[in-house]
Amino acid sequence: MKKLLTGFLVACALVVVYGHNLLPSSGIQANTKPQLTTTTSTAEAAGVTAQIAPDFTFTDLVTGKTTKLSDLRDKPVYLNFWATWCPPCVKELPHIQAKYEQYKDRINFVAISLDGEQEAPAQFIPSRGYTFPVGYGNERDISRAYNIEAIPASYIIGTDGTIKAQIVGSMDEADLESFLQKAF
């Protein structure tokens, strides 16, 4: 009887593992280890033009206003990709809120939800009292344009539209402060 039960449990475990691998996925993973890439200094040192941030249109979850990223060139942009199902993303949101309150007059903040639909972030953001701009757009096109494989992913985009720095992984408040300084 014990052998039968053990065999059954092993078979169930194999079905669960194999079945999980067959489920459709966006291919985007949650990343807890920040990996900073500063693109401008590397590009300038190599004598190469810095990468222009891919443009896209997003809709603000609160106002419903549609905006193009390229319309925000009056100030540097802090662009964050996140999702409600991503624990490292959710963990850094209070830090984003604190820095938004500190820098909103000097930096445009945009947090783009990659939840796949607007209902989850539309309920989540107000319930936590966050006031920084959160938008959504065509998740697949935006993810491809920015080559997003893991979130959270953050970018600093200069007023000239070039990517100044990018980081994949959750940041604490000190890390976020240091990252935002790349905007100036």
Report each predicted region and the residues it spans.
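N-terminal targeting signals for export/organelle localization
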Residues: M1-D55
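A short beta-strand-turn-helix
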Residues: D55-V77
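Conserved redox-active cysteine motifs that mediate thiol-disulfide chemistry
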Residues: R73, F81-E101
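Active-site acidic short loop of glycosyltransferases
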Residues: R73-K75, D105, Y130-T131, I148
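Hydrophobic beta-strand anchors of alpha/beta hydrolase catalytic cores
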Residues: Y78-L79, F109
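Short alpha-helix adjacent to the SAM-binding motif of class I
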Residues: K91, A98, A120-S127
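Thiol-based oxidoreductase modules, predominantly thioredoxin-like and allied folds used
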Residues: D105-E119, Y130-E139
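Thiol/disulfide oxidoreductase modules built on the thioredoxin-like
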Residues: Q123-T131, G137-F184
